[in-house]
Amino acid sequence: EISACLVGSEMCIRDRPVIEASSIKIAETAKMYENVQRDVLIALANEYADFCKSEGININEVTECAASKWNFAKVYPGLVGGHCIGVDTYYLMKRAKDKKQSLNLVQTARHINEAESKKVATRIKDYAVFINAQRILLLGFSYKANTPDCRNTKVADVYNELKQHCLVVDCFDP
């Protein structure tokens, strides 16, 4: 209610109407659902990207074509970091475990996304060896574009993995 009063019942945020939840518990659970859904969809994109790579198919082109269907959730493969998505997923899994419930899909998605940093680092390392590079520049360090926030960034995992292979690694985040 307070939020609705502050922004006004007719107010829109990013061209969407403000939705008034019946309780803070509903609002927080809805936000968690949104973040967990994104985690699961990115895991699907990551797995599908691996499949496409094995088939010699460009995942970005596949995604663009699939997005021509109105109800396709356009999500690209990548690292999942930050202070919301993975954190909310782990919180949900802990709450479910406390209630003796299993969330197999969510757990699998989290496992897939946690493994992605190592896969990215391996691809970079293999390419560095192929071109005989001793120095790597990682462009972008925060967990998403246009933010200085580096909390739980998975680029740090990529950086650390590359350093273990004795490569000189620099980072720049424009």
Task: Please give the residue ranges for each predicted region.
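Glycine-rich phosphate/diphosphate-binding loops that line cofactor/substrate pockets in enzymes
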Residues: R123-I136
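Active-site glycine- and acidic-residue-rich loops that bind
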Residues: H111-A121, P148-D149
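NAD(P)-binding Rossmann-fold cofactor-contacting core
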Residues: L137, K144-P174
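Anion (oxyanion) recognition and catalysis
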Residues: K53, K97, K163
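Active-site-proximal catalytic alpha-helix in oxidoreductases
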Residues: S23-C52, G82-R95, E114, T153
